Amino acid sequence: RFSEIESLITHIIEKLINSDDELINHFLIKENSLHVNLELIKKLSSFRHYEEERISEIVSKLKPLQRLRNSFIHGVWLDVTIENNETCIYCSDHRWQLTKSSSNRIQYSRYDSKRYTTRDLDKELITASEILLELKRLWQDIDEVNYF
């Protein structure tokens, strides 16, 4: 779902850029992270006065899912466990994390983990599916739009 969401966001951005040459669109955004593309789609929709509220709502729903998306791509998923009658799985992130302590000292750590229950994952995936459906509707609408 996440790759399809990112693909649709890219297509919508390309349409909002509205270049005569599709390759120019591609070169402008091909290296962008999801975070950069979310900011860009908001700016472009505002600039084009196209579905600003709708796009802003999609972005605000998608931002909380970024950690889960990053976990799927970069995370180290551990074995499934049962805790308090719930099926759980932990995902570790082995990238360096920088945090500030209460005394404003920067602390470094390499390992961060997040606990997910199957219920948590189901809920997140339902949200991702809803976002995907909204992006598909938006793509259908924008594909018929002519700005000039």
Model-based region annotation:
Residues 11-148:
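Acidic, Ser/Thr/Gly/Pro-rich intrinsically disordered interaction regions
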Residues 1-2:
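Conserved N-terminal beta-strand and adjoining loop/helix that marks the start
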